Amino acid sequence: MKPIYSSVLVMLAACSVPLDGRAAATFVDARTYPTQAAGWERFLAVEARLVRGFDDICGDTFCEGDYHNLQALRFRCSVEAASGRVEECVWTFTGSIAQVDPAQGHIVVDARTWACRAPLAPDTPLSVLLQTLEQGEALHAWLPGTSTSLYDGLMGCL
């Protein structure tokens, strides 16, 4: 009885591995959830709304300091593949200062990047997050299950 039992366990384990030999991913990029066809356009449209919102307010807020040319790069979220719950979202930015060295004539550049984590509530479903960010002013919308916005998260980051 024991040899059959262990053979069954080996067969079950083999069946749980994808055919290409890789283990199934626990987390996936939100752009490809639930499938690339279903997630890609929707997520990129939300990202474009966020970038427009940032560009609209940058001159009066974040872009008043040393890094007056801040640019939003990418907004990315990781999603638990089995449940659709967001694990984390990060929005990346870049900015620079360029000055002339008066003694040497060289251009001195201080270029930086920032990775700003979104202040999400635990276990936020991706579908609810995207629906929230598709409405009105995405940058100022309260994130699901919180009383904070992406703008609030940027205040502590940039």
Which residue ranges define each predicted feature?
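C-terminal partner/receptor-binding element of secreted or periplasmic proteins
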Residues: 121-158
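Intrinsic-disorder-associated interaction segments
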Residues: 32-39, 43, 47, 119-122, ...
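Sec-dependent signal peptide recognition
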Residues: 2-10
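Flexible, solvent-exposed short loops/turns enriched in glycine
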Residues: 100, 106-135
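N-terminal signal peptide c-region/cleavage motif recognized by signal peptidases
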Residues: 16-18
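N-terminal secretory signal peptides
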Residues: 21-88
